[in-house]
C-alpha cells in the first residue's frame, strides 16, 4: 500500500507541470523575463503597517473542498479586495488541485497596485524566476515540501530577486526549520497539507515561539472578524483569507469588515 500523502501527490503533479512549461520557456528565457519585470513592491513595509493586515486570496478550488467559486474575472475580484483594504493579494497558481494559473497572476498584477503573492508549491528555482517574471512580489515556500538545503537555497534565491518569501509551517519543528533558513515572514497553516486535517489551535501553539522581529501570518480558518481577533490575540500580524472571501456575496465588504476589526483600537496588538 502506498504511503504517499496528499502533499506528495500535489508535488508530483507540480513537477510535471513545471517541466512542461520549461520545455516551452527555458530557464534562461524566464530569467531574462524576470529581469525585465517591474521591480517588486515592498511587502515587508505593507505587512508592518499598523493593525492586523489582511492578505486576500484569489482561490478557485482546494483539495479539501473541490470547486469553491466561479471567478469570472480575477482582476475584478482583486480590485474588490484592494478597495476593501487588503494589504496583499494572494493568487493560487497551482493548476491541478486549485484550478489556478499564471494567467490569473498576470490579471491580478495588472489590476492592483498593492503587493501580490504567488501561492503555489515551489520546488524548483525555475518557479521563482517565473513568479518574478509574472510580477509577483512575494511567493510561498512550504517547509513540509522541501528538504532543508533546498528550502534555504530557494529562500536565498527569492530574496536575491527582491521578493519576499512567505515560509509556511504547520508544526513547531517546521517553524524551527523556517527560522534556521532565515525566514522573515512565517505563515502558520492550520491545515496539515499531508492529511488535509485542520488544527485551529496550531497558530496559538507556534506563534509564541517565534522571534518578535519575524512577521507572523495566520493561514486557514478565518471566516470573519471574530476569527481575525482570535488570531490577533495569539500574536498574528496578518491573516491570509481565501475560502471565506471567494464564497462571499460581497468580497469587498467582507475584506473591509476584517480590516475594520484588525485596525480597531480594541484589537490586540502584536508584541514587538
UniProtKB/Swiss-Prot annotation:
Gene Ontology terms, MF aspect: indole-3-glycerol-phosphate synthase activity; phosphoribosylanthranilate isomerase activity
EC number(s) recorded for this UniProt protein: 4.1.1.48
Protein family: Belongs to the TrpC family.
Protein's name according to its UniProt entry: Indole-3-glycerol phosphate synthase
HAMAP family: IGPS_A (MF_00134_A), IGPS_B (MF_00134_B)
UniProt keyword terms in alphabetical order: Amino-acid biosynthesis, Aromatic amino acid biosynthesis, Decarboxylase, Lyase, Tryptophan biosynthesis
Any one biological process term the GO annotation gives: L-tryptophan biosynthetic process
Keyword flag Amino-acid biosynthesis: yes
Main enzyme class: lyase
Record's catalysed reaction(s): 1-(2-carboxyphenylamino)-1-deoxy-D-ribulose 5-phosphate + H(+) = (1S,2R)-1-C-(indol-3-yl)glycerol 3-phosphate + CO2 + H2O
InterPro entries: Aldolase_TIM, Indole-3-glycerol_P_synth, Indole-3-glycerol_P_synth_dom, Indole-3-GlycerolPSynthase_CS, RibuloseP-bd_barrel
Pathway the protein takes part in: Amino-acid biosynthesis; L-tryptophan biosynthesis; L-tryptophan from chorismate: step 4/5
Pfam families, per database record: IGPS (PF00218)
Amino acid at each position: 500500500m502506498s504511503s504517499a500523502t496528499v502533499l506528495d501527490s500535489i508535488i508530483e503533479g507540480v513537477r510535471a507541470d513545471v517541466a512542461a512549461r520549461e520545455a516551452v520557456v527555458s530557464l534562461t528565457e524566464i530569467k531574462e523575463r524576470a529581469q525585465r519585470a517591474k521591480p517588486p513592491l515592498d511587502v515587508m513595509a505593507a505587512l508592518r503597517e499598523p493593525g492586523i493586515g489582511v492578505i486576500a486570496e484569489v482561490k478557485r478550488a482546494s483539495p479539501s473542498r473541490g470547486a469553491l467559486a466561479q471567478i469570472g474575472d480575477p482582476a475584478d475580484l482583486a480590485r474588490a479586495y484592494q478597495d476593501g483594504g487588503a494589504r496583499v493579494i494572494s493568487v493560487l497558481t497551482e493548476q491541478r488541485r486549485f484550478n489556478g494559473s499564471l494567467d490569473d497572476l498576470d490579471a491580478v498584477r495588472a489590476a492592483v497596485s498593492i503587493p501580490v503573492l504567488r501561492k503555489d508549491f515551489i520546488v524548483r528555482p525555475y518557479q521563482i524566476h517565473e513568479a518574478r517574471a509574472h510580477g509577483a512580489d512575494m511567493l510561498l515556500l512550504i517547509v513540509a515540501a522541501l528538504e532543508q538545503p533546498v528550502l534555504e537555497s530557494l529562500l536565498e534565491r527569492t530574496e536575491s530577486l527582491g521578493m519576499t518569501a512567505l515560509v509556511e509551517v504547520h508544526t513547531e519543528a517546521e517553524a524551527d526549520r523556517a527560522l534556521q533558513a532565515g525566514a522573515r515572514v512565517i505563515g502558520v497553516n492550520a491545515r496539515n497539507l499531508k492529511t488535509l486535517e485542520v488544527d485551529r489551535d496550531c497558530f496559538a501553539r507556534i506563534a509564541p515561539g517565534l522571534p518578535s522581529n519575524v512577521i507572523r501570518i495566520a493561514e486557514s480558518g478565518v471566516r470573519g472578524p471574530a476569527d481575525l481577533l482570535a488570531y490577533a490575540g495569539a500574536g498574528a500580524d496578518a491573516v491570509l483569507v481565501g475560502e471565506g472571501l471567494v464564497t462571499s456575496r460581497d468580497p469587498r465588504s467582507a475584506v473591509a469588515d476584517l480590516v475594520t476589526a484588525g485596525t480597531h483600537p480594541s484589537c490586540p496588538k502584536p508584541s514587538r
